[in-house]
Amino acid sequence: MNKGSKKMQRWYFRSFDTTIIRVWSSWLVNTTSEPWEYAPANLTKLKLEEPDPNLMELLPRIDVLVISGGHWFAKKTAYLLGGKLVGGQLWSHKNLGKGIPETEAFGIAMETSLSSIATDPLYKGLTILRTYSPDHYDGGTWNTGGSCTEKTRPSRPWEVAHNPHTELMRSLQ
């Protein structure tokens, strides 16, 4: 039985007395849509030093947590650190300068999330980190018409495309 929404789905398996919950946390850190300095109003702002409060609220009730993420950092976002705008992805502003890149923001967010989980005194569960997934689309990327729907088995090691960006993102986990 599936009860939920895009943000959270819940399946209960009566014969095993087991519940599986899928919690959607795009960036694993707190986000805001509030206006912030000169960042565009419609832009998602990531508070890199604050874990996702929805995930942290559920954490004490979770026995096994599987974390999978990273690809959302390629979306248009602003990065906040210490209450200041420190970078962004797919937008710029003369006052921002170069700012921190997507990869550094991802590393900070991973550290924030994993540290918060590891030090939560009420969480007694097991955490499994699924590393940043390699490129797996045929005929283009996810946003240029590529598809992964024809995949019928896991890729063999020699079939995986080696991409420096993917390898960097994995190393930051």
Write out the residue ranges for each language-model feature.
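A compositional signature for long Ser/Thr(±Pro)-rich, low-complexity
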Residues: 1-173
